[in-house]
């Protein structure tokens, strides 16, 4: 058992050195690109998955926005595989760390915004002031729109962190309750175990949905600026 409820979210170390970089790079092992796998079922599934992601994410974009296709596909596959691996027992989930999610959200958001200011300056500035705004409200609306713009990467990171962390904590609590109830009330323990199984299935769905939501919002930010 962990020392406390949040011990599983502490960055693991080996000989005093953090191994989070190795953990982050681990999902890439699951996507081999060897020529020996050209006709493999895994390769066929990956090809179908990439085509599906491109269809869902990139069809709304202009040719300039579609230059981000590789980045968008890599992002959703990385977040999805990391979230799924984090559901395995005794594993560490990098996406429960706000710093990790901010390190993804801020560069992607900044890249999209900078692209907009470079290629669509007037259109990008127009977002700060909706058409038909009364003159007396112009200063306040500009401030509000500016704040909302800078909140976007924080909202991306906090949403992903909160959803993944909440699910893991709930599984931890129900799992601990099941172990305690096994000796006190086996029928009740059976019920809580069934609830834990259902919650685990739900968390698999949440892991994929959160990867999709994070990537979709990045794609929409990009679409607004290209």
Swiss-Prot record:
Molecular-function GO term, any one: proton channel activity
Catalysis performed (reactions): H(+)(in) = H(+)(out)
Alphabetized UniProt keyword annotations: ATP synthesis, CF(0), Hydrogen ion transport, Ion transport, Membrane, Mitochondrion, Mitochondrion inner membrane, Transmembrane, Transmembrane helix, Transport
Top-rank taxon, per record: Eukaryota
Biological process according to GO: proton motive force-driven ATP synthesis; proton motive force-driven mitochondrial ATP synthesis; proton transmembrane transport; response to hyperoxia
InterPro entries: ATP_synth_F0_asu, ATP_synth_F0_asu_AS, ATP_synth_F0_asu_bact/mt, F0_ATP_A_sf
Main location: mitochondrion
Gene3D superfamilies linked to this entry: ATP synthase, F0 complex, subunit A
PROSITE patterns for the chain: ATPASE_A
Stated family: Belongs to the ATPase A chain family.
Keyword Nucleotide-binding among record annotations: no
Topology relative to the membrane: Multi-pass membrane protein
GO CC entries: mitochondrial inner membrane; mitochondrion; proton-transporting ATP synthase complex
Transmembrane segments: 6-26, 68-88, 97-117, 138-158, 164-184, 189-209
Function: Subunit a, of the mitochondrial membrane ATP synthase complex (F(1)F(0) ATP synthase or Complex V) that produces ATP from ADP in the presence of a proton gradient across the membrane which is generated by electron transport complexes of the respiratory chain. ATP synthase complex consist of a soluble F(1) head domain - the catalytic core - and a membrane F(1) domain - the membrane proton channel. These two domains are linked by a central stalk rotating inside the F(1) region and a stationary peripheral stalk.
Protein name as catalogued: ATP synthase F(0) complex subunit a
Oligomeric form and interacting partners: Component of the ATP synthase complex composed at least of ATP5F1A/subunit alpha, ATP5F1B/subunit beta, ATP5MC1/subunit c (homooctomer), MT-ATP6/subunit a, MT-ATP8/subunit 8, ATP5ME/subunit e, ATP5MF/subunit f, ATP5MG/subunit g, ATP5MK/subunit k, ATP5MJ/subunit j, ATP5F1C/subunit gamma, ATP5F1D/subunit delta, ATP5F1E/subunit epsilon, ATP5PF/subunit F6, ATP5PB/subunit b, ATP5PD/subunit d, ATP5PO/subunit OSCP.
Cell location: Mitochondrion inner membrane
């Amino acid at each position: 058992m962990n020392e406390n409820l949040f011990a599983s979210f502490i960055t693991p170390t080996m000989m005093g050195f953090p191994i989070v970089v190795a953990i982050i790079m681990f999902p890439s092992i699951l996507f081999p690109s060897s020529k020996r796998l050209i006709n493999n079922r895994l390769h066929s599934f990956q090809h179908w998955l990439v085509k599906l992601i491109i269809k869902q994410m990139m069809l709304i974009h202009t040719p300039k926005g579609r230059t981000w296709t590789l980045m968008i596909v890599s992002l959703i596959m990385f977040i999805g595989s990391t979230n799924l691996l984090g559901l395995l027992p005794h594993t560490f989930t990098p996406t429960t760390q706000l710093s990790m999610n901010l390190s993804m959200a801020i560069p992607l958001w900044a890249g999209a915004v900078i692209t907009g200011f470079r290629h669509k300056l007037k259109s990008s500035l127009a977002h700060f002031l909706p058409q038909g705004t009364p003159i007396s409200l112009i200063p306040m609306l500009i401030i509000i729109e500016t704040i909302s713009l800078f909140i976007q990467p924080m909202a991306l990171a906090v949403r992903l962190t909160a959803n993944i962390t909440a699910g893991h904590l709930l599984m931890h609590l129900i799992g601990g309750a099941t172990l305690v109830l096994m000796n006190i009330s086996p029928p009740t323990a059976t019920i809580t175990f069934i609830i834990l199984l259902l919650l685990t299935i739900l968390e698999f769905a949440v892991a994929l949905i959160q990867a999709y939501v994070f990537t979709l919002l990045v794609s929409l930010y990009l679409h607004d600026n290209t």
